[in-house]
Amino acid sequence: QIWNMEGFGSGNQVQPGMCAYGATKRAVNYVNKALQKEVKGTEVQVCTLSPGIVITDLLLGDYDTSSPEWEKSKKIFNILGDTVATVTPYLVDGILNADKSGAKVVWLTGGKAFSRFMTAGFNKRDLFADL
């Protein structure tokens, strides 16, 4: 199995400061589709992981946590984000259960994102309490 990981840019999102990262993640879609065609008829499986927003040092490294921009981003991260410890078991289970090329393991689905926004006022999360 070959697994590639999507990220910001995979779904055509564009944001200043994310050019290189977003371009490489957008390329993941093309690479996976092309590889799936190239290995068709073989035992090789080409699959995709889509972890959603995971709170990591890579994500946080470019933010000035004393800025107003950080406060806006932090609100979104607390609604849509998750910790590595939360997301990893789900991704691993998906990998272990994938049985065909083209499999995609998605943590933050559109439905889950919608639900989180709808319940954000009642379900206060603070993924940054330990920062």
Task: Please report, for each region that a protein language model flagged, where it lies by residue.
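N-terminal charge/polar-biased segments
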Residues: F122-L131
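Hydrophobic structural elements of the Rossmann-like NAD(P)H-binding subdomain
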Residues: W3-M5, V46-L49, L59
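C-terminal helical subdomain
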Residues: T48, T65-N123
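Short, flexible catalytic-loop segment of classical short-chain dehydrogenase/reductase
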Residues: G11, P51-G61, T65
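Short aromatic-enriched loop/helix-cap "lid" or pocket-rim segments at secondary-structure transitions
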Residues: P16-G17, L58-D62, F117-A120
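Catalytic loop of short-chain dehydrogenase/reductase
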Residues: Q1-K33, K37-K40, I53
